[in-house]
Each structure stands twice: as structure tokens, then as C-alpha cells.
């Protein structure tokens, strides 16, 4: 199976030796900044977001899946349907220091109703997307408990389109939740 081979290769890759939450955050933000000069004024500047009050750009959104699914997305340029709404996206960054991977997996499972998030490894990889397509902001939010017991809330979005637009990928990799 090609996805398994790609996943094995992917697992051995380290993006600029990213080993901590802070390094991953800097890497994603710099990648996002690098993309801005590549677009013409008015082109891909914002995305359509369905919500009361009009359109706004939620910025970078994140998709959490396992490694083989990530490889299928990356090389097949398509989204997995991981919720009843289509592809479930969130503004929870993969470098959030004060949550554990198992808590993120629990939150995704609760938010999506998707049994695939039972095992934390099913959400160990991320795709950071500057989504030029249509996304809908969902009414529900993802509620997580931080490692120090505080309640954290993140917005949820969904896309029902199958294909990823060219240039939607900002970065992808292994999550660094709870790492200093």
C-alpha cells in the first residue's frame, strides 16, 4: 500500500528539525507569511465563511488525521470526510502547549462523532490550510481541558468540497501538543 510507504517516509522527515511547540508555531507562521506575497491583490485574500454577520477570514485552519490519511490527502489533493459535515477543521493549532494529544483526540471525537478519533494516533498529524474555498463555521465548538485544568474552547469549521484548491496547503506534519 503506497500510503503506508509514504507514511513511513513521512515519519522519518523532520521539518527544519522541529522538536517543540514553539518551533512548530514559528515554522507555520513563517510559512503562512511567505505565501502572502505570492498572491495577487484581491486573489485568495479571504475565504467564504457562512455565519451570521457576514464573511470573515478565520486565518489558518487545521485538519487532524492519522499519517496514512494525511498522505492520501497530500498526494491525492482531497479531503477526508471525518464528520457528518464533511471535513472537520478547527482553529486549534498543532503547537498548543497546554493540551495533550489524548485530550485533543477526545475533543475531536466528541465534536465530530467520528469513531476514528478513539485512538489518539488518529489525530497525531495535521494539515495547516489557508483555505481558499468555501468553509462553514459550525454552531458547536470544541471544548478541551488544559493540562492545568482550565477550560479551552476552539471554533469548528467544515468543508464539504472533495478537492483541495491549489495552494491551500501551508504545512503538514506531526503535532506537537503539550511540548515546551
Swiss-Prot record:
Disordered, as annotated region: 31-54
Keywords assigned: Cytokinin biosynthesis, Glycosidase, Hydrolase
Gene Ontology biological-process annotations: carbohydrate metabolic process; cytokinin biosynthetic process
Chain segments annotated as coiled-coil in the UniProt record: none
Protein EC: 3.2.1.-
Cysteine-cysteine disulfides: none
Gene Ontology MF: a single term: beta-glucosidase activity
Segments traversing the membrane: none
Highest taxon in the source lineage: Eukaryota
Function: Hydrolyzes cytokinin glucosides thus liberating free cytokinins.
Name of the protein in its database record: Cytokinin-beta-glucosidase
Taxonomic source organism: Nicotiana glauca (Glaucous tobacco)
Lineage, broadest ranks: Eukaryota, Viridiplantae, Streptophyta, Embryophyta, Tracheophyta
Gene: ROLC
